[in-house]
Each structure stands twice: as C-alpha cells, then as structure tokens.
Amino acid sequence: MEPFDPAELPELLKLYYRRLFPYAQYYRWLNYGGVTKNYFQHREFSFTLKDDIYIRYQSFNNQSELEKEMQKMNPYKIDIGAVYSHRPNQHNTVKLGAFQAQEKELVFDIDMTDYDDVRRCCSSADICSKCWTLMTMAMRIIDRALKEDFGFKHRLWVYSGRRGVHCWVCDESVRKLSSAVRSGIVEYLSLVKGGQDVKKKVHLNEKVHPFVRKSINIIKKYFEEYALVGQDILENKENWDKILALVPETIHDELQRGFQKFHSSPQRWEHLRKVANSSQNMKNDKCGPWLEWEVMLQYCFPRLDVNVSKGVNHLLKSPFSVHPKTGRISVPIDFHKVDQFDPFTVPTISAICRELDMVSTHEKEKEENEADSKHRVRGYKKTSLAPYVKVFEQFLENLDKSRKGELLKKSDLQKDF
C-alpha cells in the first residue's frame, strides 16, 4: 500500500474533498429523507484544521453549501454533533439558554488504549492483528445487544482510522432519546469497571444476567485463539499472577501448583477451570463457573467510553474523515464480514489519490468539464474506497426502506380514521 507522508496531507486533502469524498451519500444520511424540517440545517459539524485549529458550530443549508465549505477549509478532521433547536452557526444570536441540543444518533466509541492492562502485544496507539480481535469481539457483543436486547435496527459501524471503532445507532426513536436514557443503555452494556488501581474489574455471582451469558458465548468463540494462544495470558509467573489477583485466595496454592506443572496457557487455563468448578471448591460461595467467566470478561469484554454515549451534544468523528497520523480513511465496516475486517488494508488518502491519478488523462478531462457534483464525486468509484462507500449505501437503503414503511403505516392509520 502507498506509504503515507503526513507532510503531504494538505495537498492530498484538497484532492480528497474535491474528487473523492462521497457528499451525496453523506448528505442523504444526515438529511434523513428531509422528513423533519431543518433537520440537516440544525446539525452541528466541527472542523479541526491544520495546526489543531478547532472550529465548532458549523452548519449548512444543503449539500452544495457543505461541499463548498469543506473544499474551502480542507479539514484535517470532521466531527458530527447534535441537531439543535436553532442553526448552530447562528448560536451567538440566540437568547442564552435557548440554544439546546435536541437530537442525535446514539453513539459508541471503543478505543484500543482502554485495553492496555490486558493486551501484551501492543500499547497506547499501536495495534496489530493479534489485538484487533478485541475490536471484533466488542463489535459482535455490542451489536448483538443493540439488535436483540433493545430492538435497534439501524447500526452503522465505522473504523476510526487508527486504533478503534465507532457505532452510530440511527433509528428515528433512538435519535430522540434523552441523556438519562442513553446513560441507562450504556450502563447496561458496561461490565468492566474501575480505574488503573482496581485489579478486579468484573464481579459476577450465581445469577448471571442473560446479556452476560450471551456475551460470554461470543467471547468463547475467540478466547482460545486470541487470549491463550495469541496473547499467551498464562505464559509465565508475571502473567499468571495477574489472573491470580482476580480469583479467591483460597484456591491460589492449588492454582500455582498446576501452573508450575503445566507448560502452556491452554493447559494452565484448563487447570484453572477444573479448580474453579471442583465440587470441593464450589462449596466456597466465591467459586463456580462464573470465576472463569469473570477472567474472560475482564480480558475480552468491550470497554466503552461512557461519556461519548451519554451526552446528546457530544461530538464524534465523522465517517469518511481522514486520520491525520495514519492517513487512513474512517470507513464503514461491513458487519456481515466483521471477522474479515482488517484495519491494515483500509485505504490511506495517499493510496486513493494515487489511484485517482492513474485514471487516464482523457477521463479526467471529461470529468473536470462536468459541472455538477453528481458526476464529479464518481472519482471514488475508481479507487479502493469504492467498496466501503457501497457498505454505506446499503446502510442508507435500509434506512430509506424503514422510513417509507413508517410513512405507509402512518397514512394507513389516517385512512382508518
């Protein structure tokens, strides 16, 4: 893949926003069929420009205005905020207290740095194929709960461009949720609790909630290959001591003896399971199958940035924004192929600009002469960004179908009266 040089970013962004950004689909998403008057016009966008210049409360009348502004500013990063009571770009003219965030998608932000206490391969901003499995498990667990436990239909998963993933839940009813309800949802989805000083972050008992059981079933599919082989979490004393800190002291000696006798993480894990589930230890109310589950959850369960989800007015990085450090595009993820998603094959801005350059001069000239934006944005179709835009379009199709279904229902009800 084309190496990315951050020094070239200003020039690359010009080309990206002029020829490659999927404006039509982007506007179609945030306009939500134009059902609610001024929905798009009251949406906040924020731009981060070169040298960390940050501009909040941007808003636009239509797709064309958004395009012009983005091509003029060439933002390093785009964030999407709430739909407000008034146009965000006029917030200074509104009476104090009257300018209120009214609606926004329910969003989730999962960042690999929050797993630094349990991943051995990388730390801070670094990721590799070994620890990416954490994101796969997180997406599977959260998506299943949003779909089955809450009945949310329209969930867009997006790669952040570096070390994490975001989820946008776009159902109409969800966009109207209060901050209190959002807090309740994120609380339901949170199991790993406590800061750096807290060693044991997951606490279960005999009454295990169905959400937890279903999450454990997902983790089980990945646990051996990810945790026992890939991360080798019981490789040596330093590592098994971390796990001993999560189980009752009454079984420490028995576990230690087995850990010293066996020579691999899978064998040592099997020993831990037997000890935790032995009839002798089960008499101790702290032992049982939930002991191994607590360890699995602490090492593999999603770690959400709670504050991002709670606030209606919280900004989150936009899909199709470019990560200024890696150059990777923040692309939608095809959830049907979530296990195959590889962050290292996500196109960089340098790669897609190069691909565009390789299009014949004749074709380019023909396109440049096309005045209207409908033709100009076809540029992405000639690059490796195309399949990701297709994923986005499929998501939009489902949103449209759902909206039409709701409108038909409403008109049928009115006919009945």
Swiss-Prot record:
The EC number(s) this enzyme carries: 2.7.7.102
An annotated GO BP: DNA replication, synthesis of primer
One MF annotation (Gene Ontology) recorded for this entry: magnesium ion binding
Binding site for Mn(2+) 1: 109, 111
Activity regulation, per record: The presence of the regulatory subunit PRIM2/p58 accelerates the kinetics of initiation and primer extension.
Motif (Zinc knuckle motif): 121-131
Cofactor: Mg(2+); Mn(2+)
Catalytic activity: ssDNA + n NTP = ssDNA/pppN(pN)n-1 hybrid + (n-1) diphosphate
Binding residue positions for a ribonucleoside 5'-triphosphate: 109-111, 160-166, 314-317, 323
Catalytic residues as annotated in Swiss-Prot or TrEMBL: 44, 109, 111
Pfam families, per database record: DNA_primase_S
Record-level GO cellular component terms: alpha DNA polymerase:primase complex
Record-listed N-acetylmethionine modification sites: 1
Quaternary data: Heterodimer of a catalytic subunit PRIM1 and a regulatory subunit PRIM2, also known as the DNA primase complex. Interacts with PRIM2/p58 (via C-terminus). Component of the alpha DNA polymerase complex (also known as the alpha DNA polymerase-primase complex) consisting of four subunits: the catalytic subunit POLA1, the regulatory subunit POLA2, and the primase complex subunits PRIM1 and PRIM2 respectively. Within the complex, POLA1 directly interacts with PRIM2.
PANTHER family xrefs: DNA PRIMASE SMALL SUBUNIT (PTHR10536)
NCBIfam families linked to this entry: primase_sml
Function as written in the Swiss-Prot or TrEMBL entry: Catalytic subunit of the DNA primase complex and component of the DNA polymerase alpha complex (also known as the alpha DNA polymerase-primase complex) which play an essential role in the initiation of DNA synthesis. During the S phase of the cell cycle, the DNA polymerase alpha complex (composed of a catalytic subunit POLA1, an accessory subunit POLA2 and two primase subunits, the catalytic subunit PRIM1 and the regulatory subunit PRIM2) is recruited to DNA at the replicative forks via direct interactions with MCM10 and WDHD1.
Additional free-text comment from the UniProt record: The bound zinc ion is not a cofactor. It is bound to a zinc knuckle motif that may be involved in sequence recognition and the binding of ssDNA.
Protein's name in the database: DNA primase small subunit
Native source organism of the sequence: Mus musculus (Mouse)
Gene, per the UniProt record: Prim1
